[in-house]
Amino acid sequence: VVDVREAEEYAAGHITNAKHIPLAQIEERLPQVVKNKKLPVIFVCATSPRSTRAQMVAKKLGYEQPEVLAGGMRAWAAASLPVVKS
């Protein structure tokens, strides 16, 4: 899971073990953080628009299974799934 929100959003609550790469840095940092392009990569933001942009960049970079967490962190929290604060 790759969280593409800004640092303050990520710190306020994120999915356990999610990697943090702000959307503006995704093209540069994704290949450093997720080296295996065959594995699924799930992008998350607040509601999905930034994740969708990250998914498009990942496809351009050759990732085979980039996905978007539908509804983003709002949907995750609304489903009472665990959130970690840092």
Per-region residue spans from a language model:
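Structural scaffold elements adjacent to functional motifs in cytosolic proteins
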Residues: 1-3
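Rhodanese-like catalytic fold shared by cysteine-dependent sulfurtransferases
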Residues: 7-42, 46-86
